[in-house]
UniProtKB/Swiss-Prot annotation:
This is Cytochrome b. Component of the ubiquinol-cytochrome c reductase complex (complex III or cytochrome b-c1 complex) that is part of the mitochondrial respiratory chain. The b-c1 complex mediates electron transfer from ubiquinol to cytochrome c. Contributes to the generation of a proton gradient across the mitochondrial membrane that is then used for ATP synthesis. InterPro entries: Cyt_b/b6_C, Cyt_b/b6_C_sf, Cyt_b/b6_N, Cytb/b6-like_sf, Cytochrome_b, Cytochrome_b_C_euk/bac, Cytochrome_b_N_euk/bac, Di-haem_cyt_TM. Keywords: Electron transport, Heme, Iron, Membrane, Metal-binding, Mitochondrion, Mitochondrion inner membrane, Respiratory chain, Transmembrane, Transmembrane helix, Transport, Ubiquinone.
Length: 380
């Protein structure tokens, strides 16, 4: 009998073991779709980004007009740009839901997979930040100025570090060119990290909604989950296309329709919606260095998740108190996102401070205590 090429060819064998004959738990729900959706987001962003880069000029005098030119004169340039800009939003929606799923079902106990995932999140945030600067509108310029300036809070080396990052004494042409280079490079780094992420995942196999070992009940990835993933792709690409075609500027800032002007500061400097929760945490601390540390901690706290797991059960499926805490945390993140979009005045300042305190209290204190408490409850 001739050998099956799919199982014997050195390259096809890898594809087969990752996407076709991969044993997957039979009961994984739609919450397990977001990994493949993130893959589709990445592919879409790289493809549209490549097409945009062909028409973009990374120069302060030309950047804004080159983007306008792409939208006006390039065939379907407006569509490519709208898909790329809104694709970023969908990328973040998917990654936040993916992380939420991991948190709820205790997937973070696969430490290597979880840690590479957090590194992926940080890389994605860096990519989105440098990408937002490229159209060189008002919010691009001032966002870049405000966020890069945060590095100056680092004691002793801060100021030198910022000037080194800027390539001068303010955000200017050298900053724009290097941000374009970084924005081109980082997505490929994300793709590489994704392969590492998957390699670690396939070492252990997927978790499942019950949080128990499922080796006795596995099904092949193809056709079951390939089909389920295709449904997911359709449900992702449909709203993305709808948003890009019907209301492409819904999530953008009107300030970015004005070319960058270092002499005029916009009334409210705020990042895109997906950074607002972290921005609110940054603003809630009246000290510059303290704010920067809180901002870093808001994402880096995810690295601690495996060490803060005190429950005997892995998933929150049968842990109602932890579930309640989890959904309070989700609501709290929505509050932080809303506060981040508001001006710095009463009552938003105090709301932001309370929400920031709640965020860290739930993650660092209440989750471990609740886990231990639920262990006690198992005895009764």
């Amino acid at each position: 009998m001739a050998p099956n090429l799919r199982k014997s060819h050195p390259l096809l064998k890898m594809v087969n073991n990752s996407l076709i004959d991969l044993p997957a738990p039979s009961n994984i729900s739609a919450w397990w779709n977001f990994g493949s959706l993130l893959g589709i987001c990445l592919l879409t962003q790289i493809l549209t980004g490549l097409l945009l880069a062909m028409h973009y000029t990374a120069d302060t005098t030309l950047a804004f007009s080159s983007v306008a030119h792409t939208c006006r004169n390039v065939q379907y340039g407006w569509l490519i740009r709208n898909l790329h800009a809104n694709g970023a939003s969908f990328f973040f929606i998917c990654i936040y839901l993916h992380i939420g799923r991991g948190f709820y079902y205790g997937s973070y106990l696969y430490k290597e997979t979880w840690n590479t995932g957090v590194i992926l999140l940080l890389t994605l945030m860096a990519t989105a930040f440098v990408g937002y600067v490229l159209p060189w509108g008002q919010m691009s310029f001032w966002g870049a100025t405000v966020i890069t300036n945060l590095f100056s809070a680092i004691p002793y080396i801060g100021q030198t570090l910022v000037e080194w990052a800027w390539g001068g004494f303010s955000v200017d042409n050298p900053t724009l060119t290097r941000f374009f280079a970084l924005h081109f490079l980082l997505p490929f780094m994300i793709a590489g990290l994704t392969l590492i992420h998957l390699t670690f995942l396939h070492e252990s196999g997927s978790n499942n909604p019950l949080g128990i070992v499922s080796n006795c009940d596995k099904i092949p990835f193809h056709p079951y989950f390939t089909l389920k993933d295709i449904l997911g792709f359709m449900l992702l690409l449909l709203p993305l296309t709808t948003l890009a075609l019907f209301s492409p500027n819904l999530l953008g800032d009107p300030e970015n329709f004005t070319p960058a002007n270092p002499l005029v500061t916009p009334p409210h400097i705020k990042p895109e919606w997906y950074f607002l929760f972290a921005y609110a945490i940054l603003r809630s601390i009246p000290n510059k260095l303290g704010g920067v540390l809180a901002l870093a901690a808001s994402v880096l706290v995810l690295f601690l998740a495996p060490f803060l797991h005190k429950a005997k059960q892995r998933a929150m499926t049968f842990r109602p108190i932890s579930q309640l805490l989890f959904w309070i945390l989700v609501a709290n993140l929505f509050i932080l996102t809303w506060v981040g979009s508001q001006p710095v005045e009463h009552p938003f300042i105090i709301i932001g401070q309370l929400a920031s305190l709640t965020y860290f209290t739930i993650l660092l204190i209440l989750f471990p205590i609740t886990g231990a408490l639920e262990n006690k409850m198992l005895n009764y």
